[in-house]
Amino acid sequence: MTKMSIRGISLNVKVMGKGYPLVLMHGGPGLDHTSLLPLKPLMHQFTLVFYDHRCNGRSEGAEVTSMTMENLTADADALRQLLGFEKWAVFGHSFGGNVALEYALRYPQNLSHLILMDTGGDQWWVNQNAPELLAKRGYSASAVQAARRFYNGQLTPGEFLPTSMKFMSAYYHHFSLLGMAKDFVFGPTPKMRPEALIFGYSKLLKGWTVMDRLGEIKVPTLVIAGRDDFLFPPEHQVALAGGITNAHLEIIERAGHEAPSERPAEIQRVVREFLSAVKADNN
């Protein structure tokens, strides 16, 4: 990774591969780009730009209160300019998809394609619906209450990990604690920032929605989600794709919210086919 000076802060950035540029916006808030590294093989067809949002991961120099949609999207566009790309394709997963939607609305002239992965256009699904869905799926009252506190930013930094572990299995179609432990030991080390999560859910995303503005997005758009995603379930994916002109919807079977790590080969295939088809149509 390289530290790049962007708008007075230091962003943690890694560029790899060759071909048309594709920036990948990670989820959270409070996480980093490592959750999207299973998509690295796309580097054989595209120039991939991984980075940590301000106040997230190993990016430095910004107060957590500066984590606004205005700054998050302006950071991304300044990164595009610094890397010398006239336009790029934008991929956003989870919270990164929220940022990607805002980017598409604020900088429509600077992206050519939009890919939304396990994300949504209205935070109600996370704040209110997700805990209720956990209850319907048989999670304990303690786990449901933990999720409600977590997704509304009602916790301290020290509670971040123990609280999330109470419902961590919900993120996956098939959850393996041993597999997660192996990823932490042998895989890239993620950098978690609990203060960003707390601010994000309690302030930044509180009441956030762009559902009434989806019709403004005109670029070719791909909406992808795991069938078992409890944060943004299939019924919301249908509404999200339906609100964007000519958006294509793909539901991935045997996958939850962490579809990039559960079904990386299938996600890569869908992304390749989407970008190739759009390119062919435009020739």
Where are these regions (language model features)?
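Active-site loop/oxyanion-hole signature of alpha/beta-hydrolase fold enzymes
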Residues: F50-F95, R269
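Flexible "cap/lid" loop of the alpha/beta hydrolase fold
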Residues: L114-G153
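Conserved alpha/beta-hydrolase "acid-adjacent" motif
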Residues: F230-H236
